[in-house]
Amino acid sequence: MHRYRSHTCAALRKSDVGSTVRLSGWVHRVRDHGGVLFIDLRDHYGMTQVVADPDSPAFKAAETVRGEWVIRVDGAVKARTDETVNRNMPTGEVELYAREIEVLSAAKELPLPVFGEPDYPEDVRLKYRFLDLRRETLHKNIVRRTEIIAAMRRRMSDIGFTEYTTPILTASSPEGARDFLVPSRIHPGNFYALPQAPQQYKQLLMVAGFDRYFQIAPCFRDEDPRADRLPGEFYQLDLEMSFVEQEDVWDAMEPMIRAIFADFAGGKPVTDKFPRIPYDAAIRKYGSDKPDLRNPIEMQEVTEHFAGSGFKVFANMIASNPKVEIWAIPAKTGGSRAFCDRMNAWAQSQGQPGLGYIFWRKEGEKLEGAGPLAKNIGEERTDAIRTQLGLGDGDACFFVAGEPAKFYKFAGEARTRAGEELNLVDRERYELCWIVDFPFYEWNEEEKRVDFAHNPFSMPQGGLTALSSDDLLSIKAFQYDMVCNGFEIASGSIRNQSPELMVKAFENVGLSQADVEERFGGLYRAFQYGAPPHGGMAFGIDRIVMLLVGAKNLREISLFPMNQQAQDLLMGAPSPAEPAQLRELAIRPVPQKKD
């Protein structure tokens, strides 16, 4: 028999009754029932109940073991009685009667429990992550993550993609976030950067004559953490294709990701045909370029109903500024003053002056609008708004006014708030969509200049003619995102493979041809030697896993994450370097000034 085990703790079944077996694992818990000890023995695969009665030669050792000790147990497999069968365990029809117990490793008193879902401080959980990972939910999440990545690899291979790996030490490149820099010992004063994404390398692969590349790529960005973004590193399913238009990328990736969701959704419905929503339409309907389509609320413009109306706040805004619009947020079943007042109070808590509203109720046989706005604009305008929005008895509507560019984010948050408060969001489904036609440029208010809105390597719609126009902010890019339940899970574009277009695109944001050659020299040179039309995208693996397992944040699906301050409490990183190491790298720390 093997030194440690003949079976795993998930393997034994009724067919094994009468067998002598050996198991090894962690003591999950010990229970004393009338002098008989019951030990739940756990390993990576599952759990088996071990029994030690006072007549057993293993009983003395069984009395000493404690939770999370690692032990080896030899014994006989016996069937449980009908009344003691545990239908919730694969091994629940049998138990192991111990004949010998060997303690392989004792455990100190635990700083946190490893069963159940303890509400322990995150820093304690991360410092003792090796214990935290023993919890069933977290353990299952990590296993499921591995299964999802394996399924991605398999499905990408099935549709003709080949996995290639690209360098981890590379040059610094402005991708929209800070780089992690790595000093060069051989070239003092110079630095490598960890890649924010394999963007340039995968495009160079297409220029080199490869096609249908993919990679499970580690990416590194020195960003502030949040619930849907880990500090430091993350992983993406990266891909690129040659001789394609954006529809070709969509047609290849939509069935693949739908199949991944269907495989791991646990029976929840998944969108069959992903709608393609232009960016501008998404902003106006949902107040976001990553809308949660499980929420049925769609905003509409109702400016005309307030122009020249008795509600002077809106009417005067419209009259004095042609950019002003009034957006309506319909809220079916929200037609109570209490709910409307809660929404108004919430808006004020967000720094807004309030949230105007109308709600409708029947007065006898007549449907009437109620609330201050209804009284000010009159019955005819109130009814016109209700008709436009398709509302009825017991429904409400909220209004946001101003220049859309300044208020659309708040309007989107109000839409989300109303949908959640009214339980309109179906949380038992996955709603996916494409967001397309992103703006190529945007206005940088801080620096008072035009800047790239998203990926600077995207192909602008309209080509050189558009880039030479006076209205740069109207240019759209062949850029697209995939969104699921309010989270961006992928982003991509058709690339700009023309050196002339590349230079012009960067000139419009204040960078010269020399700047382009210095910052993107490899890509710029490559495009001068026969570059095919190409495009691709990248899926955020961490976010996809988080959605599929129902985790609240990314730390619940990552093995050894950092905390919110970008610290690895388990390994003690970041940490000071030894003086000798710094001298070797020609680096001298500069003392930080105290505030």
Curated annotation (Swiss-Prot):
It is an enzyme of class 6 (ligase). Pfam families: GAD (PF02938), tRNA-synt_2 (PF00152), tRNA_anti-codon (PF01336). L-aspartate binds at residues 175, 221, 454, 495. ATP binds at residues 221-223, 488, 540-543. Its EC number is 6.1.1.23. Its main location: cytoplasm. It catalyses: tRNA(Asx) + L-aspartate + ATP = L-aspartyl-tRNA(Asx) + AMP + diphosphate. Aspartyl-tRNA synthetase with relaxed tRNA specificity since it is able to aspartylate not only its cognate tRNA(Asp) but also tRNA(Asn). Reaction proceeds in two steps: L-aspartate is first activated by ATP to form Asp-AMP and then transferred to the acceptor end of tRNA(Asp/Asn). Homodimer. HAMAP family: Asp_tRNA_synth_type1 (MF_00044). This is Aspartate--tRNA(Asp/Asn) ligase. It comes from Sinorhizobium medicae (strain WSM419) (Ensifer medicae). The lineage of its organism: Bacteria, Pseudomonadati, Pseudomonadota, Alphaproteobacteria, Hyphomicrobiales. The gene is aspS.
